[in-house]
């Protein structure tokens, strides 16, 4: 179990982004699990019931928009906060994120600390150096416009 006791599911197909975001989240004491595509993300969300999901939008098999809709329409996962992580940075993309059920929105590239800040907004503060035991690495930065 992690120092915060909170689990974040990171749905991201880019290995560099997964390493950065998972590393910094673990540094702040969150347990991080990972999925490489929308289909795997949906399955892990349903089986593991994470406290929060960081959802890349441009992912294979099922994109992040559709995966979010599936999770928000499922009674078992609808209350899990989902933060969109996307290179789609237009105002219309932010609106679409909210329409499909995302609870937060971060435009890439984003500073690792911005990701942490956004996660903390939903889950509370973890402390630096309070790393959990899960493997992986990542950096995140908080921001919500």
Language-model regions, residue ranges each:
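Two-component/phosphorelay signaling modules centered on CheY-like receiver
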Residues: 15-33
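C-terminal output helix
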Residues: 110-119
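Active-site beta3 strand of CheY-like receiver
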Residues: 48-54, 59
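Conserved acidic carboxylate
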Residues: 12
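The feature encodes the CheY-like receiver
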Residues: 60, 78, 90, 108
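Residue-level signal for the "D+5" position in two-component response regulator receiver
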Residues: 34, 59-62, 91, 99
